[in-house]
A protein has these predicted regions:
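A short helix->loop->beta-strand "cap" motif at the edges of active sites that frequently abuts
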Residues: 64-67, 89-91
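Rossmann-fold NAD(P)-binding glycine/threonine-rich loop
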Residues: 59, 72-94, 101-115
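Short catalytic-loop micro-motif centered on adjacent basic/acidic residues
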Residues: 45-47, 68-71, 95-96
Length: 188
């Protein structure tokens, strides 16, 4: 498969190595400098850039009729508009805030526990630690965990830092070369 990598940071470089190891051809390594290059030689694009570039990169994929997998977080305020563009162009996009099987199991467990907590007087906080190269804070994973709780409880939203009684506080730390730690805490 011919792959265009849109975003060539830590994750883009990891995907590059894995794709090559599996016999795929990486035909484009776009670092984000300048306009999105010609995507016509790619069969698929993998988008792991920065929040400011994600929507533009996705739109370029739709315009080039290239299916795209996106793992960039921090741009979801533009998600409804991007979905409309994708549908209007008969494009194909897969988005997830985290592609780890283990984390997606955690998302389901999180929602199950949130339904159990609904009628109990618990507050919720989320603490996360990631490496210092992680650009967004909080991470998309922490936001997805918070949104799963909000959907199934009386919590009204989330905030970065300490939350009020009906808010989930997300404390995001960045240190060293930590791979990523998410800790949820329910309290009375």
């Amino acid at each position: 498969m011919k792959i265009a990598l849109l975003g060539y940071g830590k994750m883009g470089q990891t995907i590059d190595r894995l794709a090559m190891d599996l016999g795929h051809e990486v035909v484009l390594r776009y670092t984000g400098d300048g306009p999105t290059p010609d995507l016509s030689t790619a069969d698929v694009a993998i988008e792991f850039s920065v929040p400011e570039a994600a929507a533009g990169n996705l739109s370029s994929c739709f315009e080039a009729d290239i299916p795209v997998v996106c793992g960039t977080t921090g741009w979801l305020d533009q998600y409804p508009e991007i979905i409309k563009k994708c549908e209007a162009s008969n494009g194909a996009m897969i988005y997830a805030s985290n592609f780890s099987i283990g984390v997606n199991l955690l998302f389901h467990l999180n929602e199950y526990l949130a339904r159990m907590m609904k009628d109990r007087p618990y507050g919720v906080d989320i603490e996360e630690t990631h490496h210092t190269q992680k650009l967004d804070a909080p991470s998309g994973t922490a936001i997805s965990l918070a949104e799963g709780i909000i959907e199934h409880t009386d919590m009204k939203g989330w905030t970065l830092g300490n939350g009020a009684e009906t808010e989930i506080g997300i404390n995001a730390r960045r240190q060293g070369d930590v791979k990523g730690i998410q800790i949820g805490r329910a309290h009375v």
